[in-house]
Regions:
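A generic structural signal for ordered secondary structure
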Residues: 2, 21, 93-97
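A solvent-exposed, acidic/Ser-Thr-rich amphipathic alpha-helical stretch
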Residues: 4, 18-20, 26-69
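Short, aromatic-enriched amphipathic alpha-helices that serve as compact interaction elements
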Residues: 1-16
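A short alpha-helix capping/helix-coil boundary motif
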Residues: 13, 27, 74-76
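A beta-strand edge to alpha-helix "cap/lid" segment located at domain peripheries
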Residues: 53-59, 63-139
């Protein structure tokens, strides 16, 4: 397993083929992002099952893949359509995944992305406040 193969799985991923992830992740995987820390394949499998049950659509567009020895990186854009975000419209989030491999599978996966871009900016009421704060910080 390498970063390119992981990227290919995420490119193809949808709610009907989540079983593909079992070929990617080590049973002792640690997965982290801005909102979660999950330990073990069963926890990660449940996370993805719940994620895809609650969204209208979720797609990953992989832009770059890099690997040196047992460490890899992916740059990506996720498009997410959820009925409670942005009135059900598509949300685009750019991110980077840091991957570590052991025994041919991903043992560590850390996603870096702006949680505000994905969530807070797309919630009723709170979204406008967050966007205003970000604009003022940029001045």
């Amino acid at each position: 397993m390498d970063a390119m193969k992981v990227g290919n799985v995420y490119r193809a991923l949808n709610k009907d083929n989540l079983h593909l992830l079992a070929d990617v992740y080590h049973r002792n995987v640690v997965f982290e992002d801005a909102a979660h820390r999950l330990e073990g394949w069963q926890a990660l499998e449940l996370y993805f099952t719940n994620l895809y049950e609650n969204v209208v659509d979720c797609r990953f567009y992989i832009h770059e893949q890099y690997q040196i020895d047992n460490v890899g990186f992916l740059t990506w854009t996720m498009t997410l359509q959820h009925p409670k975000l942005k009135k059900g419209a598509c949300v685009e989030v750019k991110g980077v995944s840091h991957l570590k491999f052991e025994a041919g599978k991903v043992i560590y996966h850390r996603d870096y992305f702006d949680l505000g871009e994905m969530l807070y900016e797309n919630l009723p009421l709170l979204g406008g406040i967050i966007r205003t704060i970000k604009q003022r910080l940029g001045q």
